Amino acid sequence: MYAAMPDERFPIPAVDISKVNRRFYRQLVDDPTGERPGTIVVDTRRFYLYLIQPRGKAMRYGVGLGRAGFEWSGRGVIQWKQEWPTWTPPAEMIAREPELEKYSAENGGMAPGLNNPLGARALYIFQDGEDTLYRLHGTPEYWTIGKAVSSGCVRLMNQDIIDLYKRVSTPSPIIVRSGALTSV
């Protein structure tokens, strides 16, 4: 499941599974959300992303999340998907971390590749027709799954974002819940 992916545009190394808690491995589970099939639900309390399947099932993935003050929650739509995306940090991030200026929109962003923070795939979250600037995306830093350390996006292991990317069509509803699954 987390083997090397040598046929990718940028060959992806295997995940050292000793650095990832087994509870975050991708697996088919009973749907705890009650949402319609095709809906993505992020449980920020447990660090899980669910892709709701038919017949009361869900594909569950472990995720990494934004640190306090950088998270997003609410309802939106996956409006766009990209393989090996270019990363362009938002102006607010560049203001906090001026060394990222070289990756600004004006400078063309960071080229796709294994060191790109968006990893192998990105799914773009829109709300009310506008890009939220939040993404579901891969990460080469798989040891951060289950932690809140990023600038707000939902990160998955590259192998998992590739699996999710194949399963999700656009547009698809997404719900990012900041509390227990029984509340929105």
Question: Language model features by range: what are they?
Answer:
Residues 1-184:
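N-terminal pre-domains immediately preceding structured catalytic cores
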